[in-house]
């Protein structure tokens, strides 16, 4: 399910689900524009048309906010499961490319709306043991809220040499320290770093 959606369409669909659940009615096209970072309402209309063509929503052309969320999953009824949203699992992160580019999304995973709160959220599969003392183990999945800034002590996803890494963030006098949570590993010291987001959750298969 959702394999036929690109990243922006999935983002719009999840945003509409959240707003309908929170307010009881769908957002306006202008609100969708602002929420997902698009400048043109015509671009949003194009994405909504695609979502309707693919059977995810139904619109009433005579009413500007009349959008009904449909479900094409036979095991799921959105009307009885309004608290869940599909969060994209990102397979890779590349410099200069949007995180939620279609080719980066490997799958989606349902998470409770109140768990992810607001903002764009994605999931990464962690490789390695650099964060084991923070309870993040090899092959865990971390839930990340997209943001470009961080506070000292935040666990972040940073982009280094075109690879995403999960570390604890510290801004110091003349550099940034990305600190592993593994006493056997050394910190990474950088003049500057690209922050992709803050880790807000972790889950694993037992």
From Swiss-Prot:
The record marks 95-96 as: Cleavage. The keyword Ribonucleoprotein does not apply. GO terms for molecular function: DNA binding; serine-type endopeptidase activity. Keywords: Autocatalytic cleavage, DNA damage, DNA repair, DNA replication, DNA-binding, Hydrolase, Repressor, SOS response, Transcription, Transcription regulation. Its EC number is 3.4.21.88. The active site is at residues 130, 167. It catalyses: Hydrolysis of Ala-|-Gly bond in repressor LexA. It holds the Pfam family Peptidase_S24. GO terms for biological process: DNA repair; DNA replication; negative regulation of DNA-templated transcription; proteolysis; SOS response. It comes from the Bacteria. Residues 29-49 bind DNA. Belongs to the peptidase S24 family. Homodimer. Represses a number of genes involved in the response to DNA damage (SOS response), including recA and lexA. In the presence of single-stranded DNA, RecA interacts with LexA causing an autocatalytic cleavage which disrupts the DNA-binding part of LexA, leading to derepression of the SOS regulon and eventually DNA repair. This is LexA repressor. It comes from Alkaliphilus oremlandii (strain OhILAs) (Clostridium oremlandii (strain OhILAs)). The gene is lexA.
